[in-house]
């Protein structure tokens, strides 16, 4: 049974298949936070067309996290369109922030960010979020919120 996450956003639903075999600590962390309701009501605080959408910061600024960090998990997954990866502030600084890639290829990020899932439904929603009006810091003018639930199968 595959582990999936349903990310209900204010713009529609994104379904993600997670990669527990390739990034076990990262998937455990994401599923734990989701199960605790950590992501519920948070926003995508950084959206860049043809690059990615980023969320998971409790402050909504890109500066916050869960109060701890954990190490990177390198794997064979490319950082390309539809991939779910951890955002960080450098090596081994993963917490709660993540991004979903909208560009065809971002492999210059490979080895710098742990890939731990991919979009299996709702890539059109990801693209729509990445193209909302935003300010000079790439924050949407109108907040795009999320709720994350973990489902099996």
Task: Name what the model sees in each region.
Residues 1-153:
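Cyclophilin-like peptidyl-prolyl cis-trans isomerases
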């Amino acid at each position: 049974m595959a582990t999936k996450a349903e990310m209900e956003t204010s713009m529609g639903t994104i379904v993600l298949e997670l990669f527990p075999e390739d990034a076990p600590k990262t998937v455990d962390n994401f599923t734990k936070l989701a199960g605790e309701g950590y992501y519920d009501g948070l926003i995508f605080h950084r959206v860049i067309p043809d690059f990615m959408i980023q969320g998971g910061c409790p402050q909504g600024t890109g500066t916050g996290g869960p109060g701890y960090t954990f190490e990177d998990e390198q794997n064979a997954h490319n950082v390309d369109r539809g991939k779910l990866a951890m955002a960080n502030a450098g090596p081994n600084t993963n917490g709660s922030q993540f991004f979903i890639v909208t560009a065809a290829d971002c492999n210059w990020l490979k080895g710098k960010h742990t890939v731990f899932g991919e979009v299996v439904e709702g890539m059109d929603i990801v693209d729509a979020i990445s193209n909302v009006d935003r300010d000079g810091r790439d924050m949407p003018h109108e907040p795009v919120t999320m709720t994350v639930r973990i489902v099996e199968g």
